[in-house]
Amino acid sequence: MTDISDESNIGYEEEVEEEIMEDDLDINNDGCDGEDKKKNSGFLKQFASKQPFYKMSLPISYSEPRSFLEKLSDQGSFLDILLKVKNIENEDDRFLEILKFYLSGWIQQKIAKSPFNPVIGETYQCKWVHKDGSTTEYIAEQISHHPPSSSFCMHNQQNGVIFHSHLSPTSKFWGNSLENSMEGKLVYEIPSLQEEYIVEAPKIIVKGVLVGSLSTETVGSTNLTCKKTGYSAEIEFKGKGLFKSKHSLLVKVKHPSSKKALYTLEGKFDGTVSITSTKTGKTTAFFDINSDQIQPITSPLHELEENNSRVVWKHVIENLLNNNEDEASKQKTIVEENQRNLAKTREGKPWIPKNFIKVDNDDNEDSANQNNVYYYSKLIEIRKEIMKNN
């Protein structure tokens, strides 16, 4: 997609090349202590071996104390936005609310560290209890470990909405930065209206991996579309870059009935987004990432199955939270060794997920399912219940 801003479009690779020139990847500079130098040196040796990036192991100090499956549940931090869309009669306003919910999950990444790569068969469940008495349930499962791929489904039957995806994270190493991409589609459904909104995830750039301070930026272009209503949004996430971009986000909302965009949106690096109607020229506040977020509820450890993320990574998480990185690293190695040993016992046998079903696109006319290689085994049942009660 072409650049929708008025600013020059500088490729991220060019910015990283400049960053490498500035830092020279010197792990012996004053920005690293002795222990960090040792850890960074070990990581560089892995990189020099030319093995696939997903098989490399980042130093434990770069780990966020939770699994990627749990991190994906952050998409539900502003669920109140999604829960009201079914009752919005105007297609225009309904599309804007779906757009707002999507942006709420990506507009500002506050944690620069990397979550654990889930082991195959790992699961994570949580729920949100809302003021209207309804409950949103979330379930995720690791479908594959090498290469990694994860599926999740978030649904609220009382309010008639479903959000699901199958994602395959990939990473590239650019000198002092990591570029994290997620192949796959995010699908938002309103079954009672037979509407599906489909979009891809942006890229997350982690800077300062080897030297300097860790920081994250959301970058990349994508399109949010609703085939039934015809609405679409061209979305461009912009990092600050070398030229200190004014906007973190630029969006154009379009419809076939109009030759020009109906709305334009601009995001700032403080987490606020404004919207301008091209018809009236009026600009208003659209979203603020600093508003209250909804915290999910997770069952106590003793109630969880052994393949739940909180159980699998229990000892790693505990030691990271207690700043015991050496022991955390040892416990992480134990988890990974167990994973390798189990893989050997399954050699030649395909892994069959417990909660998600693989889609045969040749025989399946359901577009929402076709956009995800794996979908939640109860998805069709949930749709039927929503159609029945809404």
Curated annotation (Swiss-Prot):
Q: What is the gene name? A: osbJ
What S-S linkages are listed for this chain? Answer: none
For this protein, the record's Pfam families field holds: Oxysterol_BP
Q: Output the Gene Ontology cellular-component terms.
A: cytosol; membrane
Family the UniProt entry places it in: Belongs to the OSBP family.
| An example Gene Ontology molecular-function term | sterol binding
* SUPFAM superfamilies reported for this sequence: Oxysterol-binding protein-like (SSF144000)
Protein name listed in UniProt: Oxysterol-binding protein 10
In the UniProt record, the signal sequence range is: none
